[in-house]
Amino acid sequence: MELQVVGATALSVSETTFGREFNEALIHQVVVAYAAGARQGTRAQKTRAEVSGSGKKPWRQKGTGRARSGDIKSPIWRSGGVTFAAKPQDHSQKVNKKMYRGAIKSILSELVRQDRLVVVDKFEIDAPKTKVLVQKLKDMALTDALIITASLDENLFLAARNLYKVDVRDVQGIDPVSLIAFDKVVITVDAVKQIEEMLA
């Protein structure tokens, strides 16, 4: 199959990478796993066993008129332990390499079908100026875009840093969440070739 390159001839690409069927279930599983892996999982609370304090019975069982009480660390007391205390845990989910690659291919194929993948020969700016990048995107009628280059362009990266709906990545830095988060994905010809090699 062929992808249309802006201001140039069409680029011949692999059908298996850019012409796959949309696999919603696979993409969902990989995106959920990716988001789960980003969780810190460091939250922690103390149970009644871990709270500092005496284990002595505050008052005798009967005869005071007050509610019976075993120790001051009871969860129903102020400053007591938490009943079902949260503990640090690893939220990461296993995703096979084949599944991950399949999800990326499926997303790229859907971007092509929806005309959201914009292939350009090169995407460069002369200076790390946000104003310059905004104008370049404006000329292409883009406001919300992920820019993928073969290697990370420092000028582009610095210029896009302060733009809310623009991000710059190299091929190694792409992930399923970023690919579906933007209205358009601008990708260079060299980056397309790299992705094909990476996902082959």
UniProtKB/Swiss-Prot annotation:
It comes from the Bacteria. It comes from Glaesserella parasuis serovar 5 (strain SH0165) (Haemophilus parasuis). This is Large ribosomal subunit protein uL4. GO terms for molecular function: rRNA binding; structural constituent of ribosome. Residues 43-70 are annotated as: Disordered. Pfam families: Ribosomal_L4. Part of the 50S ribosomal subunit. Belongs to the universal ribosomal protein uL4 family. One of its GO terms (biological process) is translation. One of its GO terms (cellular component) is ribosome. Signal peptide: none annotated. One of the primary rRNA binding proteins, this protein initially binds near the 5'-end of the 23S rRNA. It is important during the early stages of 50S assembly. It makes multiple contacts with different domains of the 23S rRNA in the assembled 50S subunit and ribosome. Forms part of the polypeptide exit tunnel. InterPro entries: Ribosomal_uL4 (IPR002136), Ribosomal_uL4-like (IPR013005), Ribosomal_uL4_dom_sf (IPR023574). The lineage of its organism: Bacteria, Pseudomonadati, Pseudomonadota, Gammaproteobacteria, Pasteurellales. Keywords: Ribonucleoprotein, Ribosomal protein, RNA-binding, rRNA-binding.
